[in-house]
Amino acid sequence: MENFFSKNYWSVGFQSRLYDHLSPESYFESMQKVVAGLPDGNSLSLLDAGCGSGLLLRFLADRIKEGMIYTGMDLLDSGVEATRQRAEELGIAERVTCVQSDLASPLPVDAVKYDVVVGHFSLYTLASDELRKFALENLKSVMQPEGLLVLVNPSVNYDANLIIEQSIQLVGERYGPLVAFFKQYLVYPFTKAIGLRFIQKQLRLGIWKAYSREEFTQEFERAGFEVQHVEEVYAGSAFWGIGRQVAN
C-alpha cells in the first residue's frame, strides 16, 4: 500500500482534486509571493514548469486576462488535464497552453522563448544533482536572453507542524475564525497526515531534495543565473528565489 501511495501520490491528488482541497494556506501564500515578484508587462510569456493541477492560475488569472501568455507543463496527464480544466473554469483557456513533458527531457516548446520560467515545488522531486542540472539546462534553453527563473523548493528545515500552524494563522487573518476552525479540525489533519508528512519523509530519506540556503543559491549560479532574490517562505520550510539569466 505504501509503495502504491509513493508511486501515485501526485496523480491521485490531481485526479481527485484532493491536492487542491488539502493544500495549506501557507502554500498559496508562497504562490502569491511568486506572482507578486513577477515583472510588469501585459505581454509577458511564462512557463509553469511542473504546473501540477494548475493552482498557480488562480493567482495569475488577472494577468493572463490582461495579456500574459501562459504555458503549463507537467509530467502527468492528470496534471495537464486538471490545468486545462482550471483554465476553462477561470475563463482564460484561450491564453493557456498545456503540454506534457518530463523536466529532465528535451522540452516540447523549443520554438517559444519565455520571459519567465517558474518552478514552484517541482525541481526538488529530481533527487540527483545531475538530473536537476539537466532540467535547468532544458529550462534555460527555452528562455529569452536575460529571462527570469523563479524557483520555490523545500529547505532542510521542512516542518509539517510549522506549515500547518502558519496556515491556520493565515486563514484566520484572511477569512475569519470560523473558517480557521474548519480548516484546523476538519481539513488540515488530513493535509498533514497524507500530504505534508509524506513529503517530509521523502525529503529526509533523500528521495527528494531538501536545500540549504547555500545549495539553493549555488544551483542558480551553476546553471548560469545571477541570483537577485532569496527568501524563506512556507513557514521557513522552503526557499523562494529569483535568478536572471546571465548574458553570454
Say what each PLM segment does:
Residues 76:
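Conserved SAM/SAH-binding beta-strand->alpha-helix loop
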Residues 83-84:
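Conserved SAM-binding loop
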Residues 133-145:
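A short glycine-rich, Lys/Arg-flanked "PGG" loop and its adjoining helix->strand segment in the class I
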Residues 108-117:
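A short acidic, Gly/Pro-enriched loop at the edge of an enzyme's catalytic core
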Residues 207-223:
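Short alpha-helix
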Residues 91-105:
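Conserved SAM-binding strand-loop segment of SAM-dependent methyltransferases
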Residues 1-40, 55-59, 150-179:
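Conserved class I S-adenosyl-L-methionine
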